[in-house]
Amino acid sequence: MVSTLDSQARAQQFRRDQDRQGSRTDQQMRRSTFTDGAVTYGAVGGTQAADLLYYPPAGYRPLERTVRLGSGPERFETAVAALMTWGVQRRSGFEVTDVHEGTGEHYTGIAYDDQGTPLGLQERAEREAVFAEDGSPYISNGMTAVLKVPVGPFTLSAPVRVVYVVDEPTRIGYAYGSRAHHPVSGEEAFFVELHPDGAVTFTIRRFSRPATRMGRLFGPVVRWQQRRITTRYLRALLPARSA
């Protein structure tokens, strides 16, 4: 029990240190070029934390949802191709505009042991450009875009920056963070995974909060809209949508 409490205490202290490191990372990003775009929060890469749902960045609401997409390597590859070319957003009714590659700067994330204790920052790995069969470039580190989100009779602009990409043999995905003028502040991550039993799953993780005073006043409405969008996201890679 003492060992478990010590591990949790170390994790919380590391998270506080990481929040401070995230603030420094954010400041570095803010010194980047206009093309790169600056994120509007400090805990960059926080969606990789194993204990996100229990210890989210202060003031933010966490979320994690997973849906099964089917099974087998072919289903995995099909889902990955859609995920990494903005398929989740487009199939959810969004328009993806103003896409720029950026410089490739990214947050490398935190490494954890089997008990969830943080070990430190992961080593940074360079990733070659990847393209889909139709020539569409895969989402890459530092890429920026503006999502056009339909909300009733209105369309909201949501500028984002890709802060990291996960490229493992059986787990692929990315996360983007909010930029200036995004209606919410925070980070959202999307992963497709091929499990040892052959199952293919799609997971969404995020932490967020309204970015404006008006948004905070209408917090329940904002969260309701986010739930609707999350439901669309989870359906976007289902086989029926991919056909």
How would you label these PLM feature ranges?
Residues 31, 210-243:
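A conserved amphipathic terminal alpha-helix motif
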Residues 65, 204-206, 233:
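A structural signal for short, well-ordered beta-strand segments
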Residues 141-143, 170-176, 202-205:
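A short hydrophobic beta-strand element
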Residues 148-196:
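Hydrophobic-ligand binding "helix-grip"
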Residues 194-198, 203-209:
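Compact beta-sheet-dominated globular domain cores
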